[in-house]
């Protein structure tokens, strides 16, 4: 069973959310029932997939790392990176196993999202932004079932704020209406539209030929957008019904005027996570230590590190790594043009130039997804 896919899941979700809606409309706290519902849904989904034991071990591992790191009397940088490596260790084994099939040790749906949540907690503890951990709230955050398989990647402090300030009856009515709308819209997007594209566009194309490949590029781009945005919308909508307001993951990405603008609109929770916890940390540390004679070098290398991490986050297969290389080059080129080409800055924000830049950005990203799909390899 896959979350937000299949009649059985939606039937169970409907039954599970009904008590939450009643509690919310009565102005009662939702997080205790939310924890119960998350545990029940995770047991059902992962038991059916044969991954329940792997999920339990993974969860205990990440919880132990976060709690033990918080208890350390002195948290040094080497200890931080050791904790981060250990937190990402299971994910690395899973990704390596996908390359070395059939020698995979284990598989776990949603490991990428759960790992990044745990790493974020470790980094926030080290930076002093988390003074204490509440184990039950941390466990709820790590295993919040609507976001387990497709995100968004929430932030612990924001999640905790929702738990500490539950919606009153009036606010919950608004969340209920928005949540139902997001669930319905996401279902149409992920199930109906993307399913139609897959069956009647992509599946009908021959496997070779320039025209077929070009058509596949466009079809795959729209398929992935409607599929991924739809799943994100359903996850966010379900969260609303449980009183958790997860961040938006898409904001009209195909209206972007350049690639930097695009990555502020597509898979927003992942791109901002990488920006805040990888790119910014690398650049600020490099500038502070004066690692490079040209300060811009730190920014360029930060983009390379950022986009390569994004590629590897999807998998270690060649197409994902090439996808990271491709977007590294695009982001660096974007930075150079922004810094040294005044006509470009003006061109992309006015009239016909803006339209041209939107079309170019769309095609640059679509070609990147063609690489990502593995069709060119």
Predicted regions and their residues:
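Membrane-embedded transmembrane alpha-helical bundles that form the catalytic cores
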Residues: 1-377
